[in-house]
């Protein structure tokens, strides 16, 4: 479904990700793990064509359903983002206008993807919150971002990202700004998306415990390169990579969830 083939990402002449490859099948969850600055977020931004500041894929290719993404026109990207590939951020509150109601932001998001009335879009947004099992969907739509907890804002962000049932969901540090109990809830919700809708997910995280609990495959990154990779069992139990073992030793608890 997604094939990243030996990509190098550069800003100017400086490579920040070098010779990165991974494959993701339909319904799989993969995690990119590593310290800040290791290139994790750069990889998923390259997949979505959202590299900032003149960043570019200088080598390699990215294939989605067998088609290269690197030759997409702006119109092709607009059709793809949100419908086929969607993204949630570290703090979904950052993508919500603080002086507008949740519902107004949801309506605007929906109407960028289809030509329907504001009333129809409001109903669709409310129905999506209900589909994601958020209690009091209408009250949430009427609320401002500051009136919701960080965990609830994140769940709203997930609901928005899933509105058009994308095949691929990219999650950039979706739990790092949350307390451990809420982290566990968000992790479970993303796993339910995979189980219910067959959504493929790439999770960027510095927490190997989160990755180990929810992932089929794990890629450990360091200094813009792949340091280690393999399925969950290999990384947890059989990896002999010193950096991977250091990350495992630093794993905190996750709201009572065990990763081994």
Regions found by a protein language model. Give the residues of each.
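Conserved ABC transporter NBD signature motif
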Residues: 56-68
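The feature captures the beta-strand-to-loop junction immediately N-terminal to the Walker
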Residues: 33-35
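A short, surface-exposed alpha-helical micro-motif characterized by mixed small hydrophobic
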Residues: 211-213
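ABC ATPase "signature
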Residues: 229-230, 238
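Helical segment within the ABC ATPase nucleotide-binding domain
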Residues: 184-197
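A short, proline-enriched helix->beta-strand linker immediately N-terminal to the Walker B motif
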Residues: 163-167
């Amino acid at each position: 479904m997604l094939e990243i083939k030996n990509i190098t990402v550069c800003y100017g002449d400086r490579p920040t990700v070098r010779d990165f490859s991974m494959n993701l099948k339909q319904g799989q969850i993969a995690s990119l793990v590593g310290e800040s600055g290791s290139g994790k977020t750069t990889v998923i931004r390259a997949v979505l064509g959202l590299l900032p500041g003149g960043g570019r894929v200088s080598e390699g290719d990215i294939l989605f359903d067998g088609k290269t993404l690197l030759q997409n026109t702006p119109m092709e990207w607009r059709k793809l983002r949100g419908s086929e590939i969607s993204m949630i951020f570290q703090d979904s509150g950052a993508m919500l206008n603080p002086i507008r109601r949740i519902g107004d932001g949801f309506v605007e998001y929906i109407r960028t993807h289809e030509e329907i009335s504001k009333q129809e879009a409001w109903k669709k947004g409310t129905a999506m919150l209900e589909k994601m099992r958020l209690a009091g969907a209408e009250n949430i739509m009427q609320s401002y971002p500051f009136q919701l907890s960080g965990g609830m804002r994140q769940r709203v962000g997930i609901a928005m990202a899933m509105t058009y049932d994308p095949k691929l969901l990219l999650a950039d540090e979706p739990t790092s700004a949350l307390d451990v109990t809420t982290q566990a809830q968000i992790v479970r919700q993303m796993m339910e998306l995979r189980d219910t809708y067959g959504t493929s997910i790439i999770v960027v995280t510095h927490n190997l415990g989160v990755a180990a609990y929810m992932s089929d495959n794990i890629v450990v990154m360091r200094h813009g390169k792949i340091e280690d990779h393999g399925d969950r069992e290999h990384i947890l139990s059989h990896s002999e990579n010193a950096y991977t073992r250091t990350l495992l030793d630093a794993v905190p608890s996750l709201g009572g969830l065990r990763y081994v």
